[in-house]
Amino acid sequence: VEKFRAIYTWVCNNISSDSNQHNTVARMRRKFQNDSTALIKWNNEFKRHAFKKLLKHKKTMCTGYAYLIKELSFLANLECEIVDGYARSADANIAQLETPNHSWNAVNLNNKWYLCDATWSSGFMILDHIFVKEYNTGYFLADPLLFAKSHIPLQKKWLLNNTLIQNKHVVGPLVYGETFKHNSVPVGPEKMSVDIYKNT
């Protein structure tokens, strides 16, 4: 565990999130949402640009974080996978799953899989996508029940819990960094919108 913690902490503390890349990728995902072949082609071309920027400026977006964690884990002889899926936030994937918009990692430590998100651990965005660097350990080897409230994988196996239903948390309330920092798994309400009736 400590070997992986060293990799993860180094990445989170030395790489910054790039809002420009994020906005470009989000725009192109929307543009090609009905043409997966064109999206894959564009994505493969964009990867070269993204990795050059990662090396030169130590800035990237979620895919770069996930790729770097995976590659460094490989060099340390640790089994690690990139998980693609949906991140829930105030402006994405609230009542229904739209376009996949995020990548994170699953790592096998001592024959057990764990989930982590170096992008969200490294800091957060404010106002006009200004990145604030603030390390949050809560996304490191996170509780799968809590993780599923904001991270919904394309492949169900990466929920890491057979009792979780892939789309159940789409209508649930949002959870943010402080929830993860304190490993506090909210049990209710089940829905983000609660209907209130007068005189009933």
Walk through the language-model features, giving the residues of each.
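A sequence-level detector of short, solvent-exposed, charge-rich linear segments
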Residues: 26-30, 92, 124, 159
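Generic detector of ordered secondary-structure context
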Residues: 3, 97, 167-168
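Domain-wide signal for the mature, well-folded portions of proteins, strongly enriched
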Residues: 9-10, 16, 91-92, 96-99, ...
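Secondary-structure boundary elements
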Residues: 1-58
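Hydrophobic/aromatic-rich core segments of domains that either
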Residues: 63-146
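Alpha-helical and coiled-coil interaction segments, frequently adjacent to or embedded
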Residues: 124-200
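A broad, low-specificity signal for short, low-complexity segments enriched in glycine/proline
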Residues: 40-44, 63-70, 166-168
